[in-house]
């Protein structure tokens, strides 16, 4: 099981004209713990080829690689696991496809859903959107996000790692971890930064300080 402090979700269209490979290289240099291949606008073939490149980078750096939604691509690139949403395969089916050692994550916004995901065999939860974000089409039940307090309620309700996601930056990551999250997942806080390496390192420092408080 990896550390979860800083979890990067890739999205090249939000990467300020840089490639996802460039962003991930910087994030790895900055100490990222997990990289999730998202890239919603790309074809399966494009994600597969990008996934192979990211697998080589992350394996060399001992960083976990997760594929968003697509169990087939996760298996094809030998990723460490897959992250699933409401419209994706059920957790037990993904587990059957990827094997007992794979990491299977699940997106949730409510305590009951978190408990259900844990019972189904999820290894970790992505909880959000914590704050308002422009990377998704909606913000669950609240246009401003669910807030750190609900992240804490979910963390208290389960025994698996919880990662806050949605609108998180170095300026607001602290309260998410203080509420009980094991780490924070970000897109534009790193992909849109002038220096992805420094941005990743800064987020890691914020998470570490918040955990000590």
Segments (PLM) and residue ranges:
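Structural motif
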Residues: 11-12, 85-87
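Histidine/lysine/aspartate-rich catalytic loop segments that bind and position anionic ligands
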Residues: 112-143, 154
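Conserved N-terminal beta1-alpha1 strand-loop-helix module at the mouth
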Residues: 1-80, 97-110, 115-122, 153, ...
